[in-house]
Amino acid sequence: MNDLTKFTNQIAKPETFDQIQIGLASPERIRSWSFGEIKKPETINYRTFKPERDGLFCARIFGPVKDYECLCGKYKRMKYKGVVCEKCGVEVTVTKVRRERMGHIELAAPVAHIWFLKSLPSRIGLLLDMQLKQLERILYFESYVVIEPGLTPLEKYQLLTEDELLDAQDEYGEDAFSAGIGAEAVKHMLMNLDLVQEKEDLLQELATTKSELKPKKIIKRLKVVESFIDSGNRPEWMILDVVPVIPPELRPLVPLDGGRFATSDLNDLYRRVINRNNRLKRLIELRAPDIIVRNEKRMLQEAVDALFDNGRRGRVITGANKRPLKSLSDMLKGKQGRFRQNLLGKRVDYSGRSVIVTGPELKLHQCGLPKKMALELFKPFIYARLDAKGLSMTLKQAKKWVEKERKEVWDILDEVIREHPVMLNRAPTLHRLGIQAFEPVLIEGKAIQLHPLVCSAFNADFDGDQMAVHVPLSLEAQLEARVLMMSTNNILSPANGKPIIVPSQDMVLGIYYLSMDRAGEPGEGMMLADMAEVHQALEAKAVTLHSKIVARVPQTDEDGNQYLKRFETTPGRMLIGECLPKSHKVPFEIVNRLLTKKEIGDVIDQVYRHTGQKDTVLFADAIMALGFRHAFKAGISFGKDDMIIPDSKDALVAETKELVADYEQQYQDGLITQQEKYNKVIDAWSRCGDQVANAMMEELKSSPIDPETGRQKPINAIYMMSHSGARGSPAQMKQLAGMRGLMAKPSGEIIETPIISNFKEGLTVLEYFNSTHGARKGLADTALKTANSGYLTRRLVDVSQDCVVIEEDCGTERALEMRAIVQGGSTIASLGERILGRTLAEDLIEAKSGEVIAQKGELLDEAAIAKIEAAGVQSARIRSPLVCEATQGVCGKCYGRDLARGTPVNIGEAVGVIAAQSIGEPGTQLTMRTFHIGGAAQVNEQSHLEAISDGTVQYRDIPTITDKRGRRLSLARNGEIVVIDTEGRERAIHRVPYGTHLLHENGAIISQGDRLAEWDPFTTPVITEKPGIVRYQDLVDGKTLTEQTDEATGMSSRVVTENRAAGRGKKEDLRPRLTLLDENSGEAARYMMAPGTTLSVEDGQQVEAGDILARASREAAKTRDITGGLPRVAELFEARKPKDNSIIAKIAGRIEFVRDYKAKRKIAIIPEEGEPVEYLVPKSRVIDVQEGDYVKKGDNLISGSPDPHDILEVMGVEALAEYLVAEIQEVYRLQGVKINDKHIEVIVRQMLQKVEITNGGDTTLLPGEQVDLEEMLETNGKLEEGQQPAEGKPVLLGITKASLQTRSFISAASFQETTRVLTQAAVEGKKDSLIGLKENVIVGRLIPAGTGAGMNRMRVAASSRDAALRASYRKLQESLIAPATAAEEHAAELAQGPEAAIGDDPLATVEGETHGTDADAGDYLIEGDEA
């Protein structure tokens, strides 16, 4: 019976294996897979369409073409199953075997496998320690190689040309040494390798080597050698003797009409291999001349190369139509390859798509499904229901009824659809809210109706968007759709925890209109008793929606009782108040104000937090209906006269024009440079544009009292739309009624002449032309942006996909310090915002009273945050995914709150993917451009600081000096001025440049608006710290010093220049500097002068402390492009080194200038104790420190954007995380996108998974190699007591690199560089234990996240239970063999516990960890044993 059910060798179910291993196939293995050798290149007979025998489609090898029928037709039907026909040799079985049976080709000469030869680094090359060039010369028959030199002076593996070989044979005799050519020679060389010996030699060499670069190469070779030893692969398997042939159904040949065939490219490639192989066999049999055989062998090698990876070496082999043939590698690679096309994304049944239209009368959980569509999608359910009701006898009849659409069918469709959710999806699905479940409502027509509130989640609009419908079939799928994916369960956005179901556009406008109050409306000051009176008064027109009235509004107290409370309000706001849920947590106050889109979002947020999901959904639906209704009733519209151009515009423009003319004159007079003029002009115009815009806004905002009626004039409609957040923005209004402002050239620079007109006035021809650049660039950008953003998301998902919450608490002691982000003068993100929804790592104690505000391990919710903010806490230590010590994934405590639910995160939540989606989804809103900032445009704004609040001022790390005028000057390079308000909170942190004039004492009390500091924005001074006499050193006129006279003012100044001696002779080593002599003529201080510095003192001048010796121009340091938008985010996540990166001090110590080279100078930091650290700095860069300065660890020696790798090395993981989070948030903040920090932290955690071994200890790990942190810990765990563990330092990998280095090779191969990943994995014999999400999708399992994680746990438990049962059955059988006596049985009954009597299954509580074996079952059988 068993044989009957097992038709064919059935494919293993995806649940039945735990790991997938990849390795090299030995020739024996390939032959064992094969069902026969393919000897002929023929495919099928073009007349009979029957496969040729021994050809590529041979039925004898691969199986029958028709089910249960041999080729010649002698045996037909099931009864001959398994018979092999003696005439045609075909086994009678199902055709499906043609999809799984393989064949092989026996090669007449071995060939090298191109993956192991050409995929960098070449594995064969590394093993033999030869260059790829040399290997290719051997393999493609260009030169001989010495395999065994014997006693001759030839080197082992030395290459010889034909002539050299003949000479050598003449000289030493033919048998004195062995040489070979082609793949055979390489195969010999690989077979003769003694890997274990090789490993020992390499380790020896590694220990003794002295050079810098050698160890890297040795480690590379060592890893390959070790991987061959560990994996059990043999090196000679990289050379093929047999080529496997994949099953014919996987490379089909289909006859087209007209006698032609469509075929898979693989067949062509195989045919070439077979043809050349057969020809080579014949040539060898005929004993053809060597040169001909050799040529044929080379061609065979090329044919096999093309089959495996076409185009990897030499020309691409093309088919008849000049199209490159798709080789086996191409089948896997890229978007169209097997991984991404068929395994990660499949097309599914039971789906349809149609245009969407708005469905404002739907409830939030519903969508309108066209009847026709529903009928088609739910067909099987309808058939089943028809059958169950006994309406149709047969399936055929049911089909007929459905096709005819009889009225019974529609009734049944209604029944089937009730409570059966469907999933709607809109492409592009950028985050998980792009697929949501709804209950279908049948509608006429052909378009899907979508609820307006979910549009923002789908990013849908109704201008012709289409959406797809999917039907969840199984009960579990329906359950998940209803419980997890229903639109009512997705009120909050997973990216930032704010509601995503927020009214937009018309609804916002309607609600804004309702909540306005206006002076002088009819009925102002009326007292109304309750809601009913308000409605009556509105009907009677006694009041308008905007009249200011006093009314009693029903409120709910904490016990749920209603009471009335008086409010000054308007009837419109009371209408909104009616929609609010009845709860004391959401009082009427929260809607008793002017509601813009942002405020409505806050109201929905509060309703959700305090009253729960159901009420929120009802409230959202109610407020939507209200908004639409009143937007319609208000009849808001605007005409061109609503765009009011401010009267002050002309005056402002004229004033700016004068300024610009003035700058032009200054430039002509030589007072300012071209660059400075440009910056000032741009500045002036942008200021003018802003002033015009402000004037316009003021004018639009004002709604004066109409003298005739005494009522306020209606407010400007355009202003209403913009201010409420319904549509339009101040920037757009500025273009309509202000001035268009400055435009950019295609190169990105800003054109100096602005567009003065606005769209209402109309542009001049020149202005119109200037504005076309920007417009066109915008369109081109948009197209690029989508692709770039999508790619960023894909890389992020790939790096973080296996990050899942796997346990409640990992118990780590580490934590991140969080404080408010203060930039310049304002708080960008308060402490509360940053720690909301996180877990505290230690008790928060109020400084003044010492009481504990929040406990360690508490999840901070809104209430706790309010307490913390009130107490004025400065910083808090919180848990973060970055410090989590869970081995795979993260733990719930470190992650904190699940943002989309507002509850602690569940185990199994795929937080990695959510993080990737949250960062990638707003990617399309970011800009693509790099901002070009011309020098002073940013700098000259700021030449002083003002206090933003009352309080005290504190200087951190600012040494000061007082000059002879009594001014305090800062000598700090990295000092900070901190403003602390009266409650002791840090309100602002400012970094000020060197030489700043500080106006207050440290700790002085200041009031708001006081000046704190001023500085010269254009130059950096060199200040002397001691009195003395100045001497010029190496400042030679004409070489390193020039006199420059300013034509405009006639003043001359001395400028240090770079010494470019004309003579080709020995260049003098001139290091221009000033030295300061003290009273004993000893050298007191040295100041190096960078080129471009203007000297302010004479040689021999007496100076006091605090005097300025020289000024270096700051212009040069500032003109660097600021990369913004998407490219910046990608740059940070890829951990790229910035172009002009800053140099960070690795240790604390004093600075010393060591010496100058041609283009660089060497500076060193001398610590108090220990070795000095040296840096090479290009001369073109301005060095921020002077000789003798004391620097702290992590200070900038040279300004620029820091290199994240440096930050990690010098400052550690926490500082790096802080930097990356701050920089990435900065980019998103500019676009007004909110993303929670923890998402970025999850990604950064994934980038920090690897460590570089610094000390191998007693392990097999080598210093300098990169391994997973887990791997290092595992290796250390295997050590004996007293052995030294390996140590390592964390390394930062960019997201692409990190994804390619995941432990799962399946996941890495499906990401990028497929061949390289698979080659590497095969050599190492990697096992993929299917831990991440992607691998499981690829092998077709449930992912180990969400409900899948639970299923996995259950499966493990079930299998261990099965094992226990099996063992108990065995016990039972054993007891049957020797029957027990009555007395023994009686004793056994008494010995049994009371559980046995209750009938509780003692095995029901089994929870195992592994797939059970009988051995595991031991513990559960104790009760049975006692018997």
From Swiss-Prot:
Bound cofactor: record note? Binds 1 Mg(2+) ion per subunit.
List of residues binding Zn(2+) 2: C810, C884, C891, C894
Q: Which keywords are on file for this protein?
A: DNA-directed RNA polymerase, Magnesium, Metal-binding, Nucleotidyltransferase, Transcription, Transferase, Zinc
Reaction(s) catalysed by this chain, per the record, are:
RNA(n) + a ribonucleoside 5'-triphosphate = RNA(n+1) + diphosphate
Q: One Pfam annotation, family name?
A: RNA_pol_Rpb1_2
Annotated region (Disordered), positions in chain: 1044-1065, 1394-1427
Q: Which residues bind Zn(2+) 1?
A: C70, C72, C85, C88
GO MF annotation, one: magnesium ion binding
Q: Which SMART domains match?
A: RPOLA_N
Q: Which EC number(s) does UniProt give?
A: 2.7.7.6
GO BP annotation list: DNA-templated transcription
- CDD domains reported for this sequence: RNAP_beta'_C, RNAP_beta'_N
Broad EC category: transferase
InterPro entries found in the cross-reference section: DNA-dir_RpoC_beta_prime (IPR045867), DNA-dir_RpoC_beta_prime_bact (IPR012754), RNA_pol_asu (IPR000722), RNA_pol_N (IPR006592), RNA_pol_Rpb1_1 (IPR007080), RNA_pol_Rpb1_3 (IPR007066), RNA_pol_Rpb1_3_sf (IPR042102), RNA_pol_Rpb1_4 (IPR007083)
Free-text function comment from the UniProt entry: DNA-dependent RNA polymerase catalyzes the transcription of DNA into RNA using the four ribonucleoside triphosphates as substrates.
- Kindly give the HAMAP family that the UniProt entry links to this protein: RNApol_bact_RpoC
Q: Which family does it belong to?
A: Belongs to the RNA polymerase beta' chain family.
Task: Supply the name of the protein.
Answer: DNA-directed RNA polymerase subunit beta'
What species is given as this protein's source? Novosphingobium aromaticivorans (strain ATCC 700278 / DSM 12444 / CCUG 56034 / CIP 105152 / NBRC 16084 / F199)
The gene from which this protein is expressed is rpoC
